[in-house]
Amino acid sequence: MAGAVPGAIMDEDYYGSAAEWGDEADGGQQEDDSGEGEDDAEVQQECLHKFSTRDYIMEPSIFNTLKRYFQAGGSPENVIQLLSENYTAVAQTVNLLAEWLIQTGVEPVQVQETVENHLKSLLIKHFDPRKADSIFTEEGETPAWLEQMIAHTTWRDLFYKLAEAHPDCLMLNFTVKLISDAGYQGEITSVSTACQQLEVFSRVLRTSLATILDGGEENLEKNLPEFAKMVCHGEHTYLFAQAMMSVLAQEEQGGSAVRRIAQEVQRFAQEKGHDASQITLALGTAASYPRACQALGAMLSKGALNPADITVLFKMFTSMDPPPVELIRVPAFLDLFMQSLFKPGARINQDHKHKYIHILAYAASVVETWKKNKRVSINKDELKSTSKAVETVHNLCCNENKGASELVAELSTLYQCIRFPVVAMGVLKWVDWTVSEPRYFQLQTDHTPVHLALLDEISTCHQLLHPQVLQLLVKLFETEHSQLDVMEQLELKKTLLDRMVHLLSRGYVLPVVSYIRKCLEKLDTDISLIRYFVTEVLDVIAPPYTSDFVQLFLPILENDSIAGTIKTEGEHDPVTEFIAHCKSNFIMVN
């Protein structure tokens, strides 16, 4: 445990041998020169004051202080007395206690973590950035102890926390760069000080972007927030990162994935209240079309569409030589159309409605072919049918006179229109806004409200919308529906679980099962609902199963509250059969 606390043991490796110290004394002319003219009595008093501080014999500067003291004519007896009287052996006592803990049976790793974590909390509590900077200035070079510290994860983590708390500390900024130089840039994404140094930031940006691309869609939710937070640290970091991603997005291989990440970061910035629309437009093709750029910029900045700017875009995109469709494929811009065309009660000028619909349909359906930065063809085959579908669903969704019963009569029409991805997204938003009304479920009498039935159709037709569908179902499942009695709440949650099972049957398996597994582990869900989910899933699945699915689903079945409590019909016992199949075909990993 001697290594648990920096400086805990004063050994020759750390302080140098006596012979080396003697050499230093001979070669210490520079320090002598700097002290030339100092009164010997003053030097002795200064040194004696240091010797009288607690555990000064453990300080790295002890040898230099001794040297100054003796060169000023100091007495060895005073030194020995002061150092011994003020030696309390804090570090040695820690080591002794650690040894005792290990001898009583505590794991050495656990003891080391305890000591290190306590030391970290003390350092964070008492850290003085001015003192840290002064030590650095006096050293004149990178201290050896600092290079030793950054080799260990525990102390790197300490520096990250300190750097967040003291962003102006030069010593910490230098240490972050040192950590980056040592190859640990993958750890620095959350450190704001890394964003102040271009060399460090570009290195961290490259590593983080590679991690997100390698992680794929399934890890995007985990990897993206930290990355977006780092990029959105300031205008300079946002512009630098988006400019780089804009260039990478032009690559044939992986370009679309980088563009997606850039758009997610734009959304993050917008949600945090930052208006990054001008940067978005400047990096795209909008700069070549100043009128379109001005119209788009005005609407994005205000967060709302308006007839005047929409008319400008409509004229341009109905001309013989329209701007590139990429110009209006800005996620934040398309979100504004969702609010204008699909939000219940949204008011839209009837004289301009066809313009709104045309631009949204154009962005969603037109396909362009480019060669060497020149457009060679525009395919508008699906523009008319997409416009028609958007208009039809808009009229149904925004008609406040149509209740749920009237919508049932229009289900076949809605199902036809939902086949268009842009309409499916609009319907999903409309369902979200509608069912999130506090009194919605209180007024419903059907076992499966029509709005939830529409989610099944969206799940069936559009794989890319599966995450958003599950997100909505989870939100509804976790909402307190206090206006309903207990039995009504249980029935509603069973209906929502039916939708999740349908989502699972359409291929979105692991995220759905992962969510139910979390519900079981958190113990915040009625166990009868978990049993219901298990029963419904067993009814729709059959071998062969993937290992990932078994690792997630089998522990749910083997839970004491689930196993043996699900009723079976006749001799057929799906739970036992599933467990037996898994035990004979899979090796379970705890």
UniProtKB/Swiss-Prot annotation:
Chain intervals with Acidic residues compositional bias: 21-43
GO cellular component labels: membrane; NELF complex; nucleoplasm; nucleus
Effect of K374M: Reduces RNA binding
Highest classification ranks of the organism: Eukaryota, Metazoa, Chordata, Craniata, Vertebrata
Entry keyword set: Nucleus, Repressor, RNA-binding, Transcription, Transcription regulation
Protein name, UniProt field: Negative elongation factor C/D
InterPro entries: TH1
Species whose genome carries this gene: Homo sapiens (Human)
Signal peptide: none
Gene Ontology MF terms in the entry: RNA binding
Pfam families the record matches: TH1
Tissues where the protein occurs: Widely expressed. Expressed in heart, brain, lung, placenta, liver, skeletal and cardiac muscle, adrenal, thyroid, kidney and pancreas.
Similarity comment: family membership: Belongs to the NELF-D family.
